[in-house]
């Protein structure tokens, strides 16, 4: 019987889907940025979210609270994690802002009309835990890089996957997008 008490896992490593794009809309914990207005406004990093009249305490704490994706690794092996601030289609550096998009005629304010806020990212990392053991990997970010990639070997099983960016002021914010590819074939 369906229930919200049971976490739904996103499968990684299935032969039918060797590449999976995870979006912050599916974060567990805190208040996930569930639309493009929130992504553009850097929800999870900013101390104030001007897009809402009342700010939930969770919004401020999100970056430190450890938002994650619940994933299930189907096949063990080496996986590549590509962390992004902006979607692939935007093709913008991790640290860049985005201009506001054009209005949509005949509609209320479109999400794309919100300017994309830059986040001063200096490094990126991945935390992954299988509820017993944790793995942590962190790398520096190039100023003009649209993404950062890192690889980890994983065994089949259930995990909490928490890719993140670290800012020059020492704050962390979850990676808004994470493209997982794998496992590598020999």
Segments from the language model and where they lie:
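Extracytoplasmic
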Residues: 1-186
């Amino acid at each position: 019987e369906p229930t919200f008490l049971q976490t739904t896992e996103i499968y990684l490593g299935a032969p039918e889907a060797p590449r999976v794009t995870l979006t912050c809309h599916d974060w567990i914990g805190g208040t996930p940025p569930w639309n493009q207005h929130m992504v553009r406004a850097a929800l999870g990093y900013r101390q104030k979210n001007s897009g809402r009249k009342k700010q939930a305490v969770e919004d401020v704490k999100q970056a430190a609270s450890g938002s994650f994706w619940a994933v299930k690794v189907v096949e063990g092996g080496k996986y590549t994690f590509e962390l992004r601030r902006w979607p692939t289609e935007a093709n913008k550096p991790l640290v860049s802002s985005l201009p506001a998009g054009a209005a949509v005629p005949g509609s209320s304010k479109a999400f794309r009309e919100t300017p994309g806020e830059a986040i001063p990212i200096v490094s990126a990392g991945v935390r992954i835990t299988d509820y017993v053991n944790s793995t942590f990997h962190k790398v520096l970010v190039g100023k003009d890089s649209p993404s950062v990639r890192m690889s980890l070997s994983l065994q089949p099983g259930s995990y909490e996957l928490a890719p993140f960016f670290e800012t020059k002021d020492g704050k962390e914010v979850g990676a808004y997008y994470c493209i997982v590819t794998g496992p590598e074939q020999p």
